[in-house]
Amino acid sequence: MLKSSKKEDSSKKNQNNKLIFTVRKLFSPIKNFFRKTKTPDNFFGVIKRLKINSQKMTLDERNILANLLELEYKTIEDIMVPRSDIAAIKLTTNLEELSESIKLEVPHTRTLIYDGTLDNVVGFIHIKDLFKALATKQNGRLKKLIRKHIIAAPSMKLLDLLAKMRRERTHIAIVVDEYGGTDGLVTIEDLIEEIVGRIDDEHDQQLDSDNFKVINNSTIISNARVEVEVLEEIIGEKLQNDDDEFDTIGGLVLTRVSSVPAIGTRIDISENIEIEVTDATPRSLKQVKIRLKNGLNGK
């Protein structure tokens, strides 16, 4: 296992402290919003007044301010983790089995618990509660460790969700469709990232759903959930028609095949573009490699 030096640890600590200071400084004029008012219009009025005086702000502060203003238009559907990517455990699982599953499969501090199917989520378990129960040699099922979640619609505004999480004192919302089925998941961390930006681990080599990596002039590695218009802008080629019902690169691939393709499958998208599936489950695409026969912008 690689160990970071004291100098690297100190640098990372200083970066975290700087971020905390920036957020506290910027939020001081609006810290009483959730205590005194429940009206989003009032909240954005405060933010817009801050923007008028933003000349003296640092770059970090201006970026956070811009992200706050975007919350006025963003909904849960814009940021939720889709159903196919949700990691969850059955209610009938015992503590020892859950501990092993988390070690092997679920790299999160919170894990959803469902009864029967994922459409019946009963709550979630925090990993610290699990380890405490194991340390004290508690036996039995998961019910006594389950924490409550909230239910939200995909159309709910992010600021409304943030306020609801605070009122209900929970950090997880299950997104349900019109029939009551589980459509996705949003955590408090997802909301915070929308405000302060994504904070990447220095050793994390995985791509997130907001970008892709240009390897060279003819190769791009991309998360399948990256929007097609991002790829179009990079390669200078139109791939989506106005009446198409997909938004992501994964959706583009699925329009060319009858089922989710296996890892290693190559699909010709156009005369210039070939997409190879590099990561997938039986139900969804995860990551793809995009080969440009003529190079970026035909170069």
Swiss-Prot record:
Signal peptide: none annotated. Residues 80-142, 145-202 form the CBS domain. GO terms for cellular component: plasma membrane. Keywords: CBS domain, Repeat. PROSITE patterns: CBS. Coiled coil: none annotated. GO terms for molecular function: flavin adenine dinucleotide binding. Despite the presence of the tlyC gene, the true SFG rickettsiae are non-hemolytic. This is Hemolysin C homolog.
